[in-house]
Amino acid sequence: MNQTMKDRFALKAPEGKICWQVLQQNMSQRCNFCPVSKLLRDPSSNKTIHWEEVNSKTGRIYENHDSLINWFDGSIVHLQQSIDITDSKKAFHDACFDELTNTLTRRAGKELLEKLIKAAHQNCHGFITCMFDINSLKQVNDNYGHSEGDKLIITICQTLKKYLGSGDIFFRLSGDEFIVVFTE
């Protein structure tokens, strides 16, 4: 374990300890998401299992790469390489989701719409696209303030999201303009 990880988990000497005892919170046995059992089913396969976890001790997100290796004494041991991807995930989320409405941003929405159009052409299926804006938003902002205008936008978005299917796309095109794509 490198020093950065020791510092992040506030560990002095974790070497030789079982991972769930030092890297997880309130665990009394191997984690239910641990891939060791899968790896042990065929220890000679040399496969690596890739997965993500939100760590129970730090709350950070890790991309894990687990495999079994032959140790210097001939035993087979579990090796896990973990990369903290929390900041990358946050940056990706911030780039793709509008901070006010938590809908897709213009760029992310348009990219998904392009993919949907290509898939629709290839698979000969249709969809419905709806563009709408919020009438009188300027008057709400002028008369009651931008915080009330923001509340109006948020309420409309939250209400609409309740009626969307899992394959539908909803994104903010600009200030008060939105696109909804119904796929089902």
Task: Indicate residue ranges for each PLM-predicted region.
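Short loop/turn elements at sensory-signaling interfaces that couple input to output
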Residues: 59, 64-78, 86
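Conserved long alpha-helical elements within nucleotide-processing catalytic cores of c-di-GMP signaling
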Residues: 93-96, 104-128, 135-165, 171-175, ...
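PAS-associated C-terminal cap
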Residues: 83-93
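PAS and related sensory helical modules
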Residues: 6-24, 28-30
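N-terminal capping loop/helix in small sensory signaling domains highlighted by a polar->aromatic N-x2-3-F motif
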Residues: 1-9, 105
